[in-house]
Amino acid sequence: MIRAIYFDLWGTLIYDDPDVGEQRRLLRVQRAHDALARLGLNYERADVEAGFIVAGMELQKIHAGEIDISARGRTVLFLRHIDEELPDRLDDDGWRLLDDAVLSPALEYRPVIMPAAQETLASIKKRGLPIGLISNAGATPGFVLREILDAFGLLRYLDATVFSDEVELAKPSQAIFENALDEFAVAPAEAAFVGDEPVLDVFGSRRAGLWTVQIGDKPVDGARPHARIDLLDQLDDALRQLQLID
């Protein structure tokens, strides 16, 4: 029997409708361009956009090394790809403007809750199992994602939230799963993890010793989950078949 359960975020509890990610990206570029102009720092919009694109690719490379950078580190990364000296030219007001421009667009163009996400978390909570979240953060950092989860009514079910930008570790790092296990003082074999990504979620959690349930039909790429479900409302049955819950 398991003593705790953990969830991935994107593709598991929330997802983006078509075009929302692009709208979010364009808003980020526009807000950054406008914030820089307010500070008397005039850059071509195309240069700002190009800087974000290259910085996003660099962030992916950082994640590939199973590490991450802080929320402020994201802003620095993006700004340096616009102008290497730009971060050194900002005062406190400038940092506030740019942090907001870079980090918060998801509050305006929000993701959508996965079907049955709230009901699934509520059902697990009734069992008395602690629920954790382990998520890699992209351009949107953990503190913004918590605000979104709170607005969706999901945060109240989560007893621990581990975001990559806050621990500076990224899935599939074994260490980020161990960090989450420590939150509940449970052994890997006493916990299950639910996620959609074959490498980040399935391989990562299995390598850390957790029971693994994959949601969705993304190819396993050699990483085999203990169980697979199409929708969250199938999770209880999957856990019972694995004899992890009564």
Model-derived features with residue positions:
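Asp-based, Mg2+/Mn2+-dependent phosphohydrolase catalytic module
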Residues: 1-5, 9, 22, 38-46, ...
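N-terminal helical cap/lid subdomain that shapes the substrate entry/recognition surface
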Residues: 2-122, 126-127
